[in-house]
């Protein structure tokens, strides 16, 4: 059974693939099969993924307000995907903020460049503070 962390890694992969080929969703099942995401975890993954896509404009507008010199579209694909996942969980789910931040930082350490964890932490922390 996949862990929640592995599920979030899969969501990042799905968002990345979506940006490269949004016209064809055939990649969804391929990615989930490859990462052995099944049953309840597959449902959790798809709920996160579709929730992000359904709220993408709102998420991006919110994130843009916390990006000083950049727009979300100017960031790298991986950083953008991690921020979108984190923002979605903070804005639309009951996942505790500390877990969202920790997961986003860990994903950034694993998948993005060396400066990304600090950057992602700063943006999501600002979002949490503004939400209070």
From Swiss-Prot:
Name listed for the protein in its UniProt record: Transcription antitermination protein NusB
Role: Involved in transcription antitermination. Required for transcription of ribosomal RNA (rRNA) genes. Binds specifically to the boxA antiterminator sequence of the ribosomal RNA (rrn) operons.
Family: Belongs to the NusB family.
Biological source species: Campylobacter jejuni subsp. jejuni serotype O:23/36 (strain 81-176)
Entry's Gene Ontology molecular function annotations: RNA binding
A biological process from GO: transcription antitermination
Superkingdom per UniProt: Bacteria
Keyword entries, A-Z: RNA-binding, Transcription, Transcription antitermination, Transcription regulation
Pfam families: NusB
């Amino acid at each position: 059974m996949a862990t929640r962390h592995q599920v979030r890694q899969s969501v990042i992969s799905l968002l990345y693939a979506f940006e490269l080929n949004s016209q064809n969703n055939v990649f969804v099942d391929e990615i989930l099969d490859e990462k052995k995401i099944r049953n309840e975890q597959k449902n959790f993954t798809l709920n996160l993924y579709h929730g992000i896509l359904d709220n993408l404009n709102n998420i991006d507008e919110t994130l843009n307000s916390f990006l000083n010199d950049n727009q979300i579209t100017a960031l790298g694909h991986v950083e953008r995907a991690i921020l979108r996942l984190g923002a979605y969980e903070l804005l639309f789910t009951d996942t505790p903020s500390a877990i969202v931040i920790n997961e986003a930082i860990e994903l950034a350490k694993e998948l993005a460049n060396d400066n990304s964890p600090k950057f992602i932490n700063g943006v999501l922390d600002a979002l949490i503070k503004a939400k209070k």
